[in-house]
Regions:
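Alpha-helical structural motif
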Residues: 16-19, 55, 88, 98
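ATP/Mg2+ or Mg2+-diphosphate-binding catalytic cores
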Residues: 70-115
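Alpha-helical structural elements
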Residues: 3-5, 40, 65, 78, ...
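Active-site acidic catalytic loop and adjacent metal/ATP-binding pocket
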Residues: 1-18
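Active-site activation/catalytic loop segments of kinase-like enzymes and analogous catalytic loops
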Residues: 17-50, 64-81
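All-alpha amphipathic helical-bundle segments outside canonical DNA-binding/catalytic cores
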Residues: 53-62
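Short amphipathic alpha-helical surface patches that serve as generic macromolecular interface elements
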Residues: 38-42, 56, 89
Length: 115
């Protein structure tokens, strides 16, 4: 029973809502922004360490931030990856194409947690 730590250079001190939102986004973008998956993640987290009401508001704010657009634009601008123009175009189109599902998810999340 050993634990191996990877990417320790990304380690930082941050509020809980930040970590939860990052994990949720990674999962939900692969699950068509299904609210049920988000609820399962939050319920599992709450079973160990319940979120406070104010943390739900911060979590919602983090979920609204266009992180994926920003990260993609940042990588493109600073030439952080060796992708051709078509790769960037395809990635941005993919994010745009899921915008309707993402917006519906945000609305449903807001209603579910009375935000």
């Amino acid at each position: 029973n050993k634990v191996n730590i990877i990417d320790f250079d990304y380690c930082k001190r941050e509020i809980r809502a930040y970590d939860i939102s990052n994990f949720m986004i990674k999962v939900l973008k692969r699950c068509n922004w299904n609210l049920e998956y988000a609820k399962e993640i939050i319920n599992a987290y709450n079973s160990v360490s319940p979120l406070r009401d104010d943390e739900y508001k911060v979590l919602y704010a983090y979920l609204q931030f266009p992180q994926r657009y920003w990260r993609l634009a940042n990588r493109y601008y600073y030439n952080e990856v060796n992708w051709g123009q078509n790769t960037f175009s395809n990635k941005i189109e993919s994010i745009i194409n899921e915008q309707e599902k993402f917006t519906k998810f945000l609305d449903d999340f807001k209603k579910e947690y009375s935000l």
